[in-house]
Design a protein with these regions (language model features):
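Active-site hotspot residues in diverse enzymes, especially metal/ion-binding acidic/histidine motifs
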Residues: 1-228
């Protein structure tokens, strides 16, 4: 089955639309967010397991009941083997190491969870097709977007989920408002600001939105506030 094509503007709309339905005030200012409230809001159930012993997969979206292999601990030792479990439809499975980690891990968890939510919202048509798998597994590389090949189905699906997650977690107007406040800017700059001068402001803004530095940097570059 062909993957549906969406422009980045359309994907941003999907992110904003979920905010409008979930909590429209998030569109204008940074607010605390429990991403698992979003999971429940879209009709899914969260679960946490050690998906791999090397954390190569951080999240899984389950589109129908299916067997799946998980591990008893997050570190491989000789003689260890995975065990089979049954994952139920509507499950968003997150690697337990993210839920057990430090602040930075929590920020990665936030992006991973919302990324998986958008797989569920946008891509059921694809994964419920008998020709395709019943689950979508997402690696840290795919979440960061560095390896994505937009001439492949999976690369396109990952880009779409990434873009929507960024728009949901870092809404355009809210990011502009908060960044300009942090940087004490009275007006939107006519030219993007130099990255090296804005790093501390990027870090502070990222903290407000509970995301890591790089996702906020990319978002601000996309908006046109800082140089690429």
């Amino acid at each position: 089955m062909d993957v549906r094509s969406y422009s980045d503007e359309r994907l941003d709309f999907f992110g904003d639309e979920l905010n409008r339905l979930f909590d429209s005030s998030r569109l204008e200012c940074a607010k605390p967010l429990d991403v698992y409230d979003v999971v429940e809001f879209i009709g899914c159930s969260p679960d946490w397991k050690y998906i791999t012993p090397d954390q190569s997969i951080l999240g899984v979206t389950v589109f129908d009941q299916t067997p799946f292999y998980v591990w008893d601990k997050p570190i491989y030792e000789r003689g260890d083997f995975p065990k089979e479990v049954i994952l139920e439809k509507n499950t968003i499975l997150i690697d337990r190491t993210l839920n057990e980690g430090n602040k930075q891990k929590q920020q990665i968890e936030n992006f991973t969870v919302v990324h998986e939510c958008f797989h569920w919202l946008l891509h059921k048509y694809y994964f419920e097709n008998p020709e395709n798998m019943l689950i979508q597994c997402c690696s840290e590389e795919s979440l960061l977007g560095g390896w994505l090949k937009l001439n492949t189905d999976i690369g396109i699906l990952e880009h779409q989920a990434n873009r929507c997650a960024a728009s949901f977690l870092m809404p355009h107007n809210a990011v502009v408002n908060e960044f300009m406040s942090v940087a004490r800017m009275k007006h939107f700059p006519q030219q993007p600001m130099p990255l090296h001068k804005m790093k501390s402001h990027i870090a502070k803004t990222a903290k407000l939105f509970c995301v890591n530095f790089n996702p906020m940097k990319y978002r601000l570059q996309d908006i046109g506030l800082i140089q690429k």
